[in-house]
Amino acid sequence: MGAGESGCGAAVLAYKLGFDVFVSDFGPIADKYKEMLDRHGITWEERQHTEALILNASEVIKSPGIPNEAPIIEKITAAGIPVISEIEFAGRYTRAKMVCITGSNGKTTTTSLIYHIFREAGLNVGLAGNIGKSLALQVAEGDKDYYIVELSSFQLDNMYEFRANVAVLLNITPDHMDRYGYNMQNYVDAKLRILQNQQPDDAFVFWNDDPIIKKELAKYSHGKLYPFAEKNHEGAAAYTHEENLIFTEPTPFNMELEELSLTGKHNLYNSMAAGISANVAGIRKETIREALRSFTGVEHRLEKVAMVNGVEYINDSKATNVNSCWYALQSMKKKTVLILGGKDKGNDYSEIAALVKEKCCALIFLGADNSKLKDFFGEFGLPMFDTHSIKECVAQAYKIAL
């Protein structure tokens, strides 16, 4: 179900394994994916779901963008047909070690950084999940020794037997509340699924100062604990001391904070998680150090785009929830014109209220319905502007900042 990167990758793997495969997407299918399916002789349909074919399946692989409450998925479930994710399916057919990363914020940066370290170490490694090529397609085209897998809560929802040899949980803050019935515990439970099936010799890397993780941890079995925190505490696998980043296990080493290529407190935590994950995998400390120095960052994540007439333009469009906006604002050193918009997912903007008052000189809203944003920020006394295209939005920001 679904014919994007995830669904088509799963279809190719299933075809190569000898299964009868049918791909159905209620929306249009991109030409590149039609070509991929046609090249393998895989039957597909778009803009409809033919229930007679779908409900005849022995198993359904669901793309993460399709909610379990979608009418066709409810019919599939009612028919007793198992519904799994592409990651779950691909995991059955590889012996590669899985380093899996989730969290409300920092997933893409941390996943990319871990992948960078493994590549610098010369390992046979793939980048998959919510980033890069689908895991299933990589397994189909030629397996790896390691996969670095970014996992969203949507992907974790339909995973059951999959095992993360190294599970990384960066943080848990409200996100996708619309998808989880506006129930925070449902979202938390989805994130903690990353620990299911871990064995004692696996590793669980996590932010020790996250109150939700600390509260929930006792409910789950997991591998060996590798907590990280800004300040040292008993059992910390990484922490800071004075101007140094200290890694304590399995192989102790340290480096100066100013050597890290990524800046900001949130990126310090991302670097800790990545360094521990590589350390657990047995990568030499010299390689980890050098890779943490040389990493160039991720597109659209606090990406410095241009400096025009003394005004710096920063693209942080990967910040898709309130908490990630908080981290971005915290890192701003100058007065900021903040662009907010997109789909409201049950957001609580009170988390960024103090920083908006402190850091921002104007707010620009970009979205179909900005009423909630205007209602919340209207009393702040800041200039506010409605825009309806990115071109109009940037032009307005340019005027304000001059």
Model-flagged regions — what are they?
Residues G4, F26-I29, I131, D209-D210, ...:
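Residues in the short beta-alpha loop(s) of Rossmann-like NAD(P)-binding domains
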Residues Y15-K16, E51-A57, P64-N208, I212-G223:
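Phosphate-binding loop of NTP-binding sites
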Residues G9-L17, M255-C361, D375-F376:
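Nucleotide phosphate-binding/pyrophosphate-handling subdomain across enzymes
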Residues M1-S85, F89, D375, F385:
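N-terminal leader/targeting and accessory segments in enzymes
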Residues D20-F26, F204-N208, I339-L340, K359-A368:
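Short internal beta-strands
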